[in-house]
A protein has these predicted regions:
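Cysteine-poor, low-complexity segments in flexible/peripheral regions
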Residues: 139-284
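Amphipathic alpha-helical polymerization modules
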Residues: 1-140, 271-275, 279-377
């Protein structure tokens, strides 16, 4: 009798345990109540959920980057429009029909365009500077309060976007791409001349910077990416304040010139002055105007190239966005397949459990009806 009761109670406990899991599945829609129910399935589900979390984070970053890309595209469109207007003003100024008063009026227009370009050069999106490369929390360009010279404050790096596990791709362009153009190139061992506001880039996109390595207030070498612990290129200072160096890098160097410096030269020429404020002749000014037209066309070409790069890099990011979204969709399907309960099967099992409960309790009742005397007899 005792053995029968123990057996019945054991079966009842198993039944209760299974019934709890069935009810959990029906109420939550989840296939596992505890990881120990099926450790292999549980580990697989955890892997899916971890991947989902990772790709969701990547997708959020890509979505956030959309605003940056859109802002970069819009800023470059405005920059190009302003440069087109400047080129038109140069052409108008360099004609016989435009007198000196008209040229001085154009000089004021050019100064206005310079201010506009300076503002656009420091465009931001969600607090990030569009043209500072990886240093997007720092202002891209500054203007000297005394001379009005505009200089780039960042480096030749690019902002990047996480598009896959451990994979990043470039986004946008930097200030060198947009507001500088190649003014000269120097092959290995060639001698080249440059100014303090020009930027020197090698074939590996490294920047060679004038640096004061001993803190004596005087620049004493061109250092790779501004690293004063590295080997440097020596230079000599020329009478006009420019510098001359010999390319000892073994690579081709590009000397990048700023559109802002060209605008300063252009404004001075329109006012019949040189960079020091000395008076120049109209013939000398005409030569500068012609040179400025060529330089501004080169600058405009760089802007077009930069705009194209923004577009192609944005398209690459969009392609990865579609891939990430597809992965998230597939992961959701997999998680649903492995983590979701089969409600139809559980409903059938619940009915079977109910029938089993009925039969088991019927047995328990019959056993309870048996008295010890009846049992012994």
């Amino acid at each position: 009798m005792i053995s029968s009761i123990d057996s019945i109670m054991y079966n009842l406990s198993i039944l209760n345990e299974r019934n709890e899991k069935v009810n959990y599945g029906l109420s939550t829609g989840e296939s596992l109540q505890n990881g120990s129910d099926d450790s292999m399935k549980f580990d697989y589900i955890l892997g899916i959920q971890n991947d989902t979390s990772m790709y969701s984070s990547i997708q959020e970053g890509i979505n956030y980057s959309d605003t940056f890309s859109t802002a970069s595209d819009s800023a470059l469109a405005e920059i190009k429009t302003a440069t087109e207007s400047i080129i038109a003003e140069i052409i108008k100024a360099n004609t016989d029909t435009t007198n000196q008063e008209g040229k001085e009026s154009i000089a004021l227009e050019i100064e206005g365009y310079k201010e506009l370009l300076f503002s656009l050069a420091n465009s931001q999106s969600n607090g990030e500077y569009l043209f500072s490369g990886i240093n997007s929390d720092s202002q891209s360009f500054v203007m000297d309060d005394t001379t009005g010279q505009v200089s780039y404050q960042s480096d030749n790096s690019l902002k990047s976007v996480n598009v896959e596990e451990n994979r990043y791709i470039s986004q946008g362009v930097n200030g060198i791409d947009v507001f500088y153009y190649t003014n000269n190139s120097a092959e290995a061992t060639d001698t080249f001349t440059f100014t303090s506001n020009e930027i020197i880039i090698d074939e590996d996109n490294n920047q060679w910077k004038l640096m004061d390595s001993d803190n004596d207030g005087v620049d004493d070498g061109l250092f790779l990416n501004g690293d004063i612990s590295s080997s440097s290129m020596s230079f000599t200072t020329n009478a006009d304040g420019s510098f001359t160096a010999t390319n000892s890098t073994g690579n081709t160097l590009d000397i990048k010139h700023s559109i802002f410096d060209d605008l300063d030269d252009l404004t001075n020429a329109l006012n019949l002055e040189d960079s020091s404020g000395n008076t120049i002749t109209s013939d000398e000014a005409s030569i500068i105007l012609s040179d400025s037209l060529d330089k501004l066309n080169d600058a405009y070409d760089s802007q077009n190239t930069s705009h194209s790069l923004v577009g192609s890099r944005t398209n690459s990011i969009d392609t990865f966005s579609s891939i990430v979204q597809s992965k998230l969709t597939n992961l959701a399907i997999l998680e649903n397949e492995y983590a979701s309960a089969d409600l139809t099967a559980l409903a059938v099992e619940a009915q079977a459990l109910e029938n089993t409960y009925t039969a088991l309790y019927s047995t328990i009742n019959r056993v309870n009806d048996l008295s010890l005397v009846k049992y012994l007899s």
